[in-house]
């Protein structure tokens, strides 16, 4: 019996923030390119050096990220023309998502020899644990305590 995979689940059908986020960052190469941009990688050759990715696939992902408004490109060399890829405001707003994924990976996907990556807050120099908190009461958010409703 042939089993067909669904392209999405009902919660992700239609126009939803989850579906849009998965379309932007759900591909492993795209997610890696965005993550590297948060680590100040800007040039095609730098992305290619860090990722075991074919150049045509990298070029496609960068083009897609520009089209989606996550990156913009800026020339840094004229002959031949070469570009740096910078996060837009929309792209920078993905940082909490990537920070959460990094922390989850440190906790659940490590080698058992401690966190593979420690985060430091530059202005104060202390270790950092990113948290998602309610902007009204300051409590840390727990999924079972969050409900959804259609925006009015």
Predicted ranges, named:
Residues 16-57, 129:
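N-terminal helix-turn-helix DNA-binding core of bacterial DNA-binding proteins
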Residues 31, 68, 97-108:
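Alpha-helical linker/hinge and terminal dimerization helices associated
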Residues 44, 48-76, 80:
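Canonical helix-turn-helix DNA-binding module
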Residues 26, 77-98:
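Basic, amphipathic "hinge/linker" alpha-helix immediately C-terminal to the N-terminal HTH DNA-binding motif
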Residues 1-25:
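N-terminal leader segment of winged-helix/HTH proteins
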Residues 3, 12, 30, 34, ...:
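Short histidine
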Residues 1-2, 106-152:
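C-terminal regulatory/oligomerization modules of transcriptional regulators
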Residues 50, 84-86, 118-120:
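Short aromatic/hydrophobic contact patches that present stacked aromatics
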């Amino acid at each position: 019996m042939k089993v067909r995979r669904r392209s999405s689940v009902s919660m992700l059908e239609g126009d939803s923030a989850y579906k849009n986020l998965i379309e932007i960052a759900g591909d492993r190469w795209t997610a890696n390119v965005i993550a590297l941009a948060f680590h100040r990688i800007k040039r095609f050759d730098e992305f290619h050096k860090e990722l075991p990715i074919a150049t045509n696939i990298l070029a496609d992902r960068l083009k897609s990220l520009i089209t989606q408004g996550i990156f913009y490109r800026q020339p840094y060399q004229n002959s031949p023309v070469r570009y740096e890829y910078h996060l837009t405001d929309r792209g920078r707003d993905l940082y909490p998502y990537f920070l959460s994924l990094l922390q989850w990976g440190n906790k659940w996907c490590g080698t058992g020899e401690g966190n593979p990556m420690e985060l430091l807050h530059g202005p104060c120099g202390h270790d950092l644990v990113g948290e998602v908190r309610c902007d009204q009461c300051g409590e840390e958010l727990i999924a079972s305590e969050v409900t959804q409703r259609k925006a009015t």
